């Protein structure tokens, strides 16, 4: 498929025009015209770029690309090395950030819910483009049980901040993959029993303790593996691309 046709297909699927983002979504660095082999991964790090080159990929498809709002505009240093390597190897770079978080089937939030056994009830912000979700478990569980489940699914032990009432059972839950810790306030105002995200701030601890809500910091990278993986699998199954997902270790 032509690289611009692939971008059009991804745009049609993920609808980036529907949500305001902090970076451009779509084809960020243009490479060879014909795309057959794609490598997917969470972040367009040099390690992932080199792995894609080793596999003779035509395109790299990621969740975290380049050209973020308020980042230095000059193409130099680490940013310069990455982009120069892409261009020298004629490697296309496609990136989809918030549109991939919120897709109802392929998105990071949807994929995490599926793996944790969460029944999705809706968007925490109350509109279709909400980047945080809420739902429920069919069977209530303790904070320790949910922490264990998260650890088993993501292969990473989460940081669990229990509320002052530590034995509170969890039936209703909110979540936002990546850096969505501040959505705990919306979750608490809705009266949810728990909130899950990738990261945690110092203030999150007190929000959890004082508002009677369990908080689980499960890892930015770990919570966002599965959307880009699902998108690649969809491209392979429905459009015949040769797709390889590569998970570059990141403990954050």
Swiss-Prot record:
Residues the entry annotates as binding a divalent metal cation 1: 63, 101, 224
Keyword Metal-binding among UniProt keywords:
yes
The GO molecular function terms of this record are: metal ion binding
Q: Where does a divalent metal cation 2 bind?
A: 64, 220, 224
The record's annotation in InterPro entries points to: DUF34/NIF3 (IPR002678), DUF34/NIF3_sf (IPR036069)
Q: Which UniProt keywords apply?
A: Metal-binding
For the keyword Membrane, the answer is: no
Q: Record's Gene Ontology CC terms? A: cytoplasm
Q: Belongs to which family?
A: Belongs to the GTP cyclohydrolase I type 2/NIF3 family.
Q: Quaternary arrangement and interactors, per the entry?
A: Homohexamer.
Q: What is this protein called?
A: GTP cyclohydrolase 1 type 2 homolog
Q: Which organism is it from?
A: Vibrio cholerae serotype O1 (strain ATCC 39315 / El Tor Inaba N16961)
